[in-house]
Amino acid sequence: MADSRDDLAESLQNLFTSVSSMVKSELQGTNNHLDLLEKMNLRVASEYDDMGDVAAGLRVFAEQMKSKSGGLDEFVGQMDAIEKQVSEFEAVISVLDRYVSVLESKIRAEYRHPHHQRRSNDSVVTD
C-alpha cells in the first residue's frame, strides 16, 4: 500500500506540476499578449502625437493663409475699383470715338461737296 500511495503521490505531484506548467504557460502567453498590446498602444500614441503635430502645423498654416487673404482682400477691392474706372474710361472713349467718326464724316462730306465759298477777306458765304 505504501507503494500505491507513493505512486499516487507521485502521480498527483506530476499532475500538479503539469497543471502548474500549463497555468504558467498560459500566464506567460497572456503576459506576452499584454506586452504586445502595450507596444502597440505606445506606437499608436506616437502616431497620434505626430498627427497632432501635423494638425497644429496645418492650423498655423491656415491662420497664416487667412491673414494673407485679408491683405489680399484690400488689393482685390483696389482691383475692382480700377476695373470699374477702366470700364468708365472705355465708355467715354467709345463716345469720343463715335463723335470723332461723326466729325470725320462731316469733314469728308464738306471736302467732297463744299457748300461754302470763301471771299477774299476769308469770311464764309453760304450758297
Curated annotation (Swiss-Prot):
Belongs to the BLOC1S2 family. Keywords: Cytoplasm, Endosome. This is Biogenesis of lysosome-related organelles complex 1 subunit 2. It comes from Arabidopsis thaliana. Pfam families: BLOC1_2. The gene is BLOS2. InterPro entries: BLOC1_su2. It is found in: Cytoplasm; Endosome. The keyword Cytoplasm applies. One of its GO terms (cellular component) is BLOC-1 complex. Component of the biogenesis of lysosome-related organelles complex-1 (BLOC-1). Interacts with BLOS1 and SNX1. The keyword Cytoplasm applies. Component of the biogenesis of lysosome-related organelles complex-1 (BLOC-1), a complex that mediates the vacuolar degradative transport via the intracellular vesicle trafficking from the endosome to the vacuole. Its main location: cytoplasm.
